């Protein structure tokens, strides 16, 4: 993919933050968004290649479209879009999850992904090749008690990705990405301190970027494990 420009959602912490640093270290231009401006400023100070970060609520389509336009103005059209931003519900049996919390999980994980695709896909159609990566989970193909909203949202991402793959022009591809079990704030919200025994985001990012850099048209519509 050339030029090497990646756009990642949810870069203020966790996997998105680690991916941004790893891609930069490999010579990529990095664009990214999150809600926390101070975290974006700090991340930008850690990168050496051209980059562009903006505070964006990915559940707001107008904000995402504006962001996509400014990414292209500053760095050009990304050849790789990574829909990483995600949210998990607080551990609770399904009937005790509030309507607001249930909807918020879907708004971020599913609608936010749709908004990013809606904003960037038309612009990527002019590329010689491009890839859209939608973050799934082990819970996108399995289930667990007390995280039903999150499981449902990731099953939705799996279906969305496979359907999108059938619609894309021949120069574009999409995959669902299962990152495995990584020690992030999200995992700690479920597992508590036990999450600390799992791989750290910065270590995961090294082999995850290896995976992402080697994706090809033959992967279109599949779920890959990084």
Predicted regions, residues:
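Conserved glycine-rich cofactor-binding loop
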Residues: 12-13
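Conserved glycine-rich Rossmann-like NAD(P)H-binding loop of the short-chain dehydrogenase/reductase
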Residues: 26-42
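The beta1-alpha1 cofactor-binding region of Rossmann-like NAD(H)/NADP(H)-dependent oxidoreductases
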Residues: 55-66, 99
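Substrate-binding pocket helix/loop in short-chain dehydrogenase/reductase
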Residues: 92-94, 101-103
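Active-site helix of classical SDR
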Residues: 117, 153
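Residue(s) in the substrate-gating loop at a strand-loop-helix junction
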Residues: 137
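C-terminal helical subdomain
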Residues: 170-172, 176-177, 182-184, 193-226
């Amino acid at each position: 993919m050339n030029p090497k420009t990646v756009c990642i959602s949810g870069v203020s912490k966790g996997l998105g933050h680690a991916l941004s640093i790893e891609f930069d270290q490999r010579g990529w231009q990095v664009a990214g968004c999150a809600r926390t401006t101070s975290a974006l400023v700090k991340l930008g100070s850690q990168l050496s290649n051209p980059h562009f970060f903006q505070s964006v609520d990915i559940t707001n389509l107008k904000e995402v479209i504006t962001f996509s336009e400014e990414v292209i103005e500053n760095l050009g059209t990304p050849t790789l879009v990574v829909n990483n931003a995600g949210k998990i519900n607080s551990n609770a049996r399904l009937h005790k999850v509030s309507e607001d919390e249930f909807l918020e999980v879907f708004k971020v994980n599913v609608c936010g992904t749709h908004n990013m695709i809606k904003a960037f896909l038309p612009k990527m159609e002019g590329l010689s090749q491009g890839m859209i990566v939608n973050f799934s989970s082990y819970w996108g193909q399995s289930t667990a008690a007390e995280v039903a909203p999150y499981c449902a949202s990731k099953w939705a991402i799996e279906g969305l990705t496979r359907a999108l793959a059938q619609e894309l022009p021949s120069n574009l591809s999409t995959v669902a990405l299962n990152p495995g079990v990584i020690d992030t704030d999200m995992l700690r919200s479920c597992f508590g301190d036990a999450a600390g025994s799992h791989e750290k985001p910065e270590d995961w990012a090294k082999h995850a970027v290896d995976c992402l850099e080697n994706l090809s048209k033959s992967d279109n519509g599949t779920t890959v494990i990084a």
